[in-house]
Amino acid sequence: MKHSLKYNLGIFTSLPLLPLLYFQGKNIRKNVPTLPEAKETTGFVNNNFSSDLHILTIGESTIAGVGVDYHKNGFTGALAKKLSTKLQKNIHWRVYARSGYTVAKVTTKIIPKIKETKVDLIVIGMGGNDAFTLNSPKKWLRDIENLIVSIQDKFPEAPIYFTNMPPIKEFPAFTKTIKFVIGNLVEIFGSELKNKLQSKKNVFYYDEIITLKNWSERNNLSHENSSIYFSDGVHPSELTYKIWANEMATFISSKFKA
């Protein structure tokens, strides 16, 4: 109820800003370079452990590795390396993601294409595109439910881990207006997801809100140079993928039962 009220108040506040959002969004799309998705969607981290783990990462542009050349240098590659060390397992990894996809599109366009039969854990990174398209929290939760069901139909035993929401309020390419409207909306999505998953078995959400200040302090990096975290003002840099993946690996390893 609290988050629905926050959303409704946000809509009321944002309505006069919609024309401005439209023109600012067009200007950002014109000025931000279109970066390709990362190459090589499969990999293997072999640390000579006695057993292997098979993981899938699923999602939007961040999981698709926009901002780096190869997935081994992006979120999934960094996640696999850190998980291998933390779980003492060799890691087979595979990426299923597409830039620009919402949760609904991932469910209908990507999940049916998954060919693997053996999967030990699944990581999902979503939220940005659903916020950019101004989906409501109600639709967001409905689409999340459909996504979870479609994955669990294929892999009923595999735990599912949702990453934090993207830190839209930190994107240097975005205007204050876009950060306010879209940034608040994606945080509502995160809160709604957290509440929903409390009653879900074997599905987890890392709910920490990402801030560059926290990341800089934890990793002894300068607070003054936010550009090191972004490849184009919107998508992560290789550094960001590594920091984000390492934190996600710590969260997963705290929940995962081999």
Stretches with model-predicted labels:
Residues 215-227:
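Short, flexible, mixed-charge acidic loops at enzyme active sites
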Residues 226-258:
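Histidine-centered active-site loop/cap adjacent to the catalytic His
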Residues 54-56, 62-142:
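Conserved SGNH/GDSL esterase-like catalytic core that processes O-acyl groups on lipids
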Residues 103, 107, 141, 145, ...:
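Short, amphipathic alpha-helical "lid/cap" segments that border enzyme active or binding sites
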Residues 1-56, 249-257:
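N-terminal secretory targeting modules
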Residues 155-159:
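A short helix->loop->beta-strand "cap" motif at the edges of active sites that frequently abuts
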